[in-house]
C-alpha cells in the first residue's frame, strides 16, 4: 500500500504519495492545480496535476476519464506523456507528467520570438497535431498556454480534457475565443480536425507579431474581427450555418474583402505569410492539414517525412456517448489506473467493490 502525505497549496490539499517531494505551485486552471515535484524514483522533475472534484458530477467524472484515456493512448514526442497516475484516499485524481519549464503564452508575453524559434515551434505544433489527428482525436482547445516548452526548445501539446472524436456532428462551444475557428462560431455543430489547424494558425500569427491576431471581446465581436482581415465567409460556408439567428447575423454584416496578410505582417518573410494564408481559411475543407503544413517550404529546415509519425491505432471513443452515473465512471477510471500499473483487476477486488475502499491499493 502506498503511503500518502498532505500539503496545502494555494489553500488546496495536495495528497500525494511519498514518491513525490518538493511540491511547488506551477499553475491553476478551471479543472485542476498543477505543481512541480521531484520524483524520488527517477530523481527527475515532474508535473503533478490534481483534478479538482473529479467525482462531483457525472460530467466531470467523464471529462477526467476521457483525459486519462487520451494520456494513456497518445505517445508522441510533441504530446505530453503520462508517467504516473493515482487516486488519493480522499478520492482525488492525480496525473503525473514530464515537467517543462514554461509555456508559449509566457514566452510570447516576455519577449519577441526570433525567426528560427517561430519556425521550430510551429513545426513541432504541426508535428504533434499530425499524430493526434491520425489517432482520430481533435484537441479543440489549442492555445499558447497549452503548449509547453523546455530549455532545449522541445515543445509538447498538453491539456486534452476537451478533446473529442473526429465527428461531423461534433457540438459545443469549446476553445478559448481568440483561437476559435469560425466554423465553431457559425454552426456549433459540424467541425473536425481543421479547427486545430485554425488555432495553430492563430498561434503562428501571434508568434510573428507578438500579440493575438483576433482578440474578440465576445463571439460576435470575434467573428467581426475575423471578417475584417479575412473578408466575408464564402457562400459555401454560409450554407452550412444551422442556426437561423447566426445566419441572420452573418448576412447583416457588411461585405468585406480579404486583406493581404503580407500587409498585416510586413516584417514576416513571404514563405511564412504563405503558410499562414493556407492555415487561416474560412472553409475548413480548403484549409491546409497538419501533414500538408509540415511539408510547406517554410518548414523545410525541419521537415523530415521519415520522422513525423502517425498513431499506430485509432483512439477508442466507444465510451464517449455513454451517460453513466458517477459510480460507474469511478469503477471505469479505477480499471484504467490498474491497467496502467499492470495490476490484475480481479485480484484487486475491482468488481463490485466501491472505489474509495480500494484506492490506496494502487501501486506506485
From Swiss-Prot:
Active-site residues, as the UniProt record annotates them: 141
Cysteine pairs bridged by disulfides in the record: none
Matching Pfam families: Pkinase (PF00069)
Record's subcellular location: Cytoplasm; Nucleus
Residues given in the record as ATP binding sites: 26-34, 49
Activity regulation text: Activated by tyrosine and threonine phosphorylation.
Reactions catalysed, as given in the entry: L-seryl-[protein] + ATP = O-phospho-L-seryl-[protein] + ADP + H(+); L-threonyl-[protein] + ATP = O-phospho-L-threonyl-[protein] + ADP + H(+)
Origin: domain of life: Eukaryota
Post-translational modification: Dually phosphorylated on Thr-171 and Tyr-173, which activates the enzyme.
Enzyme class at the top of the EC tree: transferase
Function: Proline-directed serine/threonine-protein kinase involved in a signal transduction pathway that is activated by changes in the osmolarity of the extracellular environment. Controls osmotic regulation of transcription of target genes.
Protein known as: Mitogen-activated protein kinase HOG1
Lineage: Eukaryota, Fungi, Dikarya, Ascomycota, Pezizomycotina
Gene: HOG1
Amino acid at each position: 500500500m502506498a503511503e500518502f502525505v498532505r500539503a496545502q497549496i494555494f489553500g488546496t490539499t495536495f495528497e500525494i504519495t511519498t514518491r513525490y517531494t518538493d511540491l511547488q505551485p506551477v499553475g491553476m486552471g478551471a479543472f485542476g492545480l498543477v505543481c512541480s515535484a521531484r520524483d524520488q524514483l527517477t530523481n527527475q522533475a515532474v508535473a503533478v496535476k490534481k483534478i479538482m472534484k473529479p467525482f462531483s458530477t457525472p460530467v466531470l467524472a467523464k471529462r477526467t476519464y476521457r483525459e486519462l484515456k487520451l494520456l494513456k493512448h497518445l505517445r508522441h514526442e510533441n504530446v505530453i506523456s503520462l508517467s504516473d497516475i493515482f487516486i488519493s484516499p480522499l478520492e482525488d485524481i492525480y496525473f503525473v507528467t514530464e515537467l517543462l519549464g514554461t509555456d508559449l503564452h509566457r514566452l510570447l508575453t516576455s519577449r519577441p520570438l526570433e525567426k528560427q524559434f517561430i519556425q521550430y515551434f510551429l513545426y513541432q505544433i504541426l508535428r504533434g497535431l499530425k499524430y493526434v489527428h491520425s489517432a482520430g482525436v481533435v484537441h479543440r482547445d489549442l492555445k499558447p498556454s497549452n503548449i509547453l516548452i523546455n530549455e532545449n526548445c522541445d515543445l509538447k501539446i498538453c491539456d486534452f480534457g476537451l478533446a473529442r472524436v473526429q465527428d461531423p456532428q461534433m457540438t459545443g462551444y469549446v476553445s478559448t475565443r481568440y483561437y476559435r475557428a469560425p466554423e465553431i462560431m457559425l454552426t456549433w455543430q459540424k467541425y473536425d480536425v481543421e479547427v486545430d489547424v485554425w488555432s495553430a494558425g492563430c498561434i503562428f500569427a501571434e508568434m510573428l507579431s507578438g500579440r493575438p491576431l483576433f482578440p474578440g471581446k465576445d463571439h460576435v465581436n470575434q467573428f467581426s474581427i475575423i471578417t475584417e482581415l479575412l473578408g466575408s465567409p464564402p457562400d459555401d460556408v454560409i450554407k452550412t450555418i444551422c442556426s437561423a439567428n447566426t445566419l441572420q447575423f452573418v448576412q447583416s454584416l457588411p461585405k468585406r474583402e480579404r486583406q493581404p496578410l503580407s500587409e498585416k505582417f510586413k516584417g514576416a518573410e513571404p514563405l511564412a505569410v504563405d503558410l499562414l494564408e493556407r492555415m487561416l481559411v474560412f472553409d475548413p475543407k480548403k484549409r491546409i492539414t497538419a501533414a500538408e503544413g509540415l511539408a510547406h517550404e517554410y518548414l523545410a529546415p525541419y521537415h523530415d517525412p521519415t520522422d513525423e509519425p502517425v498513431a499506430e491505432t485509432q483512439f477508442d471513443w466507444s465510451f464517449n456517448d455513454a451517460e453513466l452515473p458517477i459510480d460507474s465512471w469511478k469503477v471505469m477510471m479505477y480499471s484504467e489506473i490498474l491497467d496502467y500499473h499492470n495490476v490484475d483487476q480481479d485480484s484487486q477486488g475491482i468488481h463490485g467493490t466501491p472505489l474509495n475502499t480500494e484506492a490506496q491499493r494502487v501501486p506506485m
